[in-house]
Amino acid sequence: MIIGLGSDLCNIERIQASLDRFGERFENRVFTDVERAKAARRPFTRAGTYAKRFAAKEAFSKAVGTGFKRGVFMKDIGVVNAPSGAPTLALTGGAAERLAAMIPPGHTAHIHLTLTDDHPWAQAFVIIEAIKD
């Protein structure tokens, strides 16, 4: 059963402006080590790489119904790739706790994530599914 749905649209140029203005301070505050390493490998599309991940974090916060409140922080939500290459989320801290609180007993959470970009926009959709054990 679907227990959460979130989407976000992010302006890549806005992310580039934050990178230009705040540099590593912005990167370290918002993105995980894995996300920063991926962006560093993509110097010509770094802002787009970050914008998709920023949108994914926003979409997840909407899917769990809290936004960035109640202990859910951007850095607790990391975009990673499954062995198949598909994007998914790795959660820690308050984000993981909020997701666990939403899942009914006898179910396991499954997060579906899709990312896309077409300059100047990046977009993410998150669907949280509870699958019966």
UniProtKB/Swiss-Prot annotation:
Domain of life: Bacteria
Primary enzyme class: transferase
EC number assigned by the record: 2.7.8.7
Keyword entries, A-Z: Cytoplasm, Fatty acid biosynthesis, Fatty acid metabolism, Lipid biosynthesis, Lipid metabolism, Magnesium, Metal-binding, Transferase
Subcellular localization, as worded in the UniProt entry: Cytoplasm
Secretion signal span: none
Tagged with keyword Lipid metabolism: yes
Gene Ontology BP terms: fatty acid biosynthetic process
UniProt binding sites for Mg(2+): 8, 58
InterPro entries named among the record's database cross-references: 4-PPantetheinyl_Trfase_dom, 4-PPantetheinyl_Trfase_dom_sf, ACPS, Ppantetheine-prot_Trfase_dom
Named cofactor requirement(s): Mg(2+)
GO cellular component terms, semicolon-separated: cytoplasm
GO molecular function: holo-[acyl-carrier-protein] synthase activity; magnesium ion binding
Catalytic activity: apo-[ACP] + CoA = holo-[ACP] + adenosine 3',5'-bisphosphate + H(+)
Family according to the record: Belongs to the P-Pant transferase superfamily. AcpS family.
Function: Transfers the 4'-phosphopantetheine moiety from coenzyme A to a Ser of acyl-carrier-protein.
Cross-referenced HAMAP family: AcpS
Name of the protein this chain belongs to: Holo-[acyl-carrier-protein] synthase
Species: Sphingopyxis alaskensis (strain DSM 13593 / LMG 18877 / RB2256) (Sphingomonas alaskensis)
Gene: acpS
